A protein has these predicted regions:
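Short, glycine/charged-enriched secondary-structure capping and boundary segments
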Residues: 21-24, 49-52, 83, 122-126, ...
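Surface-exposed, flexible loop/turn segments at secondary-structure boundaries
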Residues: 14, 42-44, 75, 116, ...
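N-terminal subdomain of nucleotide-sugar transferases
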Residues: 1-61
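Acceptor-binding helix/loop patch of EC 2.4 sugar-transfer enzymes
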Residues: 11, 74-82, 129-160
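Structural motif
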Residues: 5, 106-107
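An aromatic- and histidine-rich active-site surface loop
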Residues: 17, 84-95, 107-129, 135-144
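Short, well-ordered alpha-helices that flank and scaffold nucleotide-derived cofactor binding pockets
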Residues: 25, 29, 96, 100, ...
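A conserved catalytic-core segment of Leloir-type glycosyltransferases
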Residues: 38-98, 102
Length: 160
Protein backbone atom coordinates (compact mmCIF):
# COMPACT_ATOMS: atom_id res chain seq x y z
CA UNK A 1 0.00 0.00 0.00
CA UNK A 2 1.31 3.44 -0.97
CA UNK A 3 2.04 5.89 1.83
CA UNK A 4 -0.18 8.94 2.15
CA UNK A 5 1.54 12.17 1.13
CA UNK A 6 0.94 15.47 2.86
CA UNK A 7 2.18 18.95 2.08
CA UNK A 8 2.62 21.32 5.01
CA UNK A 9 2.64 25.00 4.07
CA UNK A 10 3.97 27.28 6.80
CA UNK A 11 6.08 30.40 6.93
CA UNK A 12 7.86 29.25 10.09
CA UNK A 13 9.51 25.86 10.45
CA UNK A 14 12.54 24.23 12.06
CA UNK A 15 14.95 25.52 13.30
CA UNK A 16 12.41 28.12 14.40
CA UNK A 17 10.57 26.96 17.50
CA UNK A 18 6.95 26.42 16.43
CA UNK A 19 4.46 23.65 17.18
CA UNK A 20 4.38 22.68 13.50
CA UNK A 21 7.77 20.98 13.99
CA UNK A 22 6.11 18.53 16.41
CA UNK A 23 3.12 18.07 14.11
CA UNK A 24 5.41 17.14 11.20
CA UNK A 25 7.27 14.69 13.44
CA UNK A 26 3.90 13.16 14.37
CA UNK A 27 2.94 12.77 10.71
CA UNK A 28 6.26 11.05 10.04
CA UNK A 29 5.82 8.76 13.06
CA UNK A 30 2.40 7.79 11.66
CA UNK A 31 4.06 6.72 8.41
CA UNK A 32 3.08 9.67 6.21
CA UNK A 33 5.40 11.11 3.58
CA UNK A 34 5.75 14.81 4.33
CA UNK A 35 6.91 17.76 2.25
CA UNK A 36 7.17 21.18 3.90
CA UNK A 37 7.05 24.50 2.02
CA UNK A 38 8.39 27.21 4.31
CA UNK A 39 10.45 30.36 4.51
CA UNK A 40 13.99 31.00 5.65
CA UNK A 41 14.30 31.01 9.45
CA UNK A 42 14.55 34.50 10.94
CA UNK A 43 11.87 34.62 13.66
CA UNK A 44 11.70 36.22 16.22
CA UNK A 45 14.80 38.44 16.00
CA UNK A 46 14.60 39.15 12.28
CA UNK A 47 18.10 37.79 11.63
CA UNK A 48 18.82 34.73 9.51
CA UNK A 49 19.62 31.72 11.65
CA UNK A 50 23.22 30.41 11.39
CA UNK A 51 23.71 28.59 8.09
CA UNK A 52 20.90 30.52 6.35
CA UNK A 53 20.84 33.68 4.26
CA UNK A 54 18.88 35.28 1.48
CA UNK A 55 20.68 32.76 -0.75
CA UNK A 56 19.31 29.62 0.93
CA UNK A 57 19.66 26.74 1.47
CA UNK A 58 16.51 25.94 -0.51
CA UNK A 59 16.29 22.16 0.09
CA UNK A 60 16.76 20.31 3.37
CA UNK A 61 15.63 17.20 5.16
CA UNK A 62 14.11 17.37 8.63
CA UNK A 63 13.87 13.94 10.29
CA UNK A 64 12.64 12.44 7.01
CA UNK A 65 10.50 15.34 5.78
CA UNK A 66 11.52 17.07 2.55
CA UNK A 67 11.85 20.78 3.28
CA UNK A 68 11.50 23.28 0.42
CA UNK A 69 12.41 26.79 1.48
CA UNK A 70 11.46 29.93 -0.40
CA UNK A 71 12.60 33.50 -0.26
CA UNK A 72 11.17 36.08 2.09
CA UNK A 73 12.17 39.52 3.29
CA UNK A 74 13.54 39.07 6.81
CA UNK A 75 12.00 40.90 9.74
CA UNK A 76 15.39 42.61 10.32
CA UNK A 77 15.02 45.11 13.14
CA UNK A 78 11.36 44.14 13.66
CA UNK A 79 10.18 47.59 12.57
CA UNK A 80 6.61 47.97 11.38
CA UNK A 81 7.73 48.36 7.77
CA UNK A 82 9.99 45.27 7.86
CA UNK A 83 7.30 43.13 9.48
CA UNK A 84 4.81 44.31 6.85
CA UNK A 85 7.31 43.46 4.08
CA UNK A 86 7.87 40.05 5.66
CA UNK A 87 4.12 39.41 5.86
CA UNK A 88 3.68 40.31 2.19
CA UNK A 89 6.80 38.68 0.77
CA UNK A 90 6.50 35.16 2.15
CA UNK A 91 3.09 34.26 0.67
CA UNK A 92 4.09 35.76 -2.67
CA UNK A 93 7.40 33.89 -2.89
CA UNK A 94 5.79 30.69 -1.55
CA UNK A 95 3.04 30.88 -4.17
CA UNK A 96 5.60 31.15 -6.94
CA UNK A 97 7.66 28.28 -5.49
CA UNK A 98 4.92 25.68 -5.97
CA UNK A 99 6.47 24.53 -9.26
CA UNK A 100 9.41 23.14 -7.25
CA UNK A 101 7.21 20.67 -5.37
CA UNK A 102 6.79 17.10 -6.64
CA UNK A 103 3.01 16.94 -6.14
CA UNK A 104 0.95 13.80 -5.64
CA UNK A 105 -0.40 15.05 -2.31
CA UNK A 106 -3.36 13.46 -0.59
CA UNK A 107 -3.85 16.51 1.63
CA UNK A 108 -2.40 19.93 2.37
CA UNK A 109 -2.11 21.46 5.83
CA UNK A 110 -1.61 25.19 6.19
CA UNK A 111 -0.10 26.14 9.53
CA UNK A 112 -1.44 29.66 9.43
CA UNK A 113 0.35 32.24 11.54
CA UNK A 114 -0.83 35.81 11.27
CA UNK A 115 -1.98 37.46 9.11
CA UNK A 116 -4.52 35.20 7.46
CA UNK A 117 -3.13 35.93 3.96
CA UNK A 118 -0.43 33.37 4.83
CA UNK A 119 -2.91 30.72 3.64
CA UNK A 120 -2.80 31.95 0.02
CA UNK A 121 0.04 29.61 -1.10
CA UNK A 122 -1.70 26.62 0.53
CA UNK A 123 -4.96 27.39 -1.27
CA UNK A 124 -3.06 27.75 -4.56
CA UNK A 125 -1.30 24.43 -3.87
CA UNK A 126 -4.66 22.77 -3.23
CA UNK A 127 -5.90 23.96 -6.60
CA UNK A 128 -2.68 23.04 -8.42
CA UNK A 129 -2.36 19.57 -6.90
CA UNK A 130 -6.12 18.90 -6.63
CA UNK A 131 -5.84 18.13 -2.92
CA UNK A 132 -8.02 19.19 0.02
CA UNK A 133 -6.62 22.00 2.19
CA UNK A 134 -7.01 22.30 5.95
CA UNK A 135 -5.88 25.40 7.78
CA UNK A 136 -4.67 25.47 11.37
CA UNK A 137 -5.29 29.15 12.22
CA UNK A 138 -3.22 30.42 15.13
CA UNK A 139 -4.04 34.10 15.12
CA UNK A 140 -7.02 35.88 13.66
CA UNK A 141 -5.29 39.08 12.68
CA UNK A 142 -6.25 41.93 12.58
CA UNK A 143 -9.39 40.89 14.46
CA UNK A 144 -7.33 40.28 17.60
CA UNK A 145 -6.04 43.85 17.31
CA UNK A 146 -9.61 45.15 17.46
CA UNK A 147 -10.25 43.20 20.63
CA UNK A 148 -7.60 45.23 22.48
CA UNK A 149 -7.76 48.59 20.69
CA UNK A 150 -10.86 50.75 20.22
CA UNK A 151 -10.78 50.90 16.38
CA UNK A 152 -14.12 52.32 15.30
CA UNK A 153 -13.34 53.25 11.69
CA UNK A 154 -15.87 51.36 9.53
CA UNK A 155 -13.53 51.24 6.54
CA UNK A 156 -10.72 49.64 8.58
CA UNK A 157 -13.13 47.14 10.15
CA UNK A 158 -14.56 46.31 6.72
CA UNK A 159 -11.12 45.59 5.30
CA UNK A 160 -10.46 43.21 8.19
Amino acid sequence: MQKKRILVVTQHFWPENFRINDIVEGFLADGLEVDVLCGLPNYPKGKWFPGYSGKGPWRENYKGANVYRCREISRKGNTGLRIFANYCSWPLFARFSLHRLPGGYDAILCYNTSPVLMCWPALAAGKKFKAPVSSYVLDIWPENLYSVLPVKNKLLRGIA
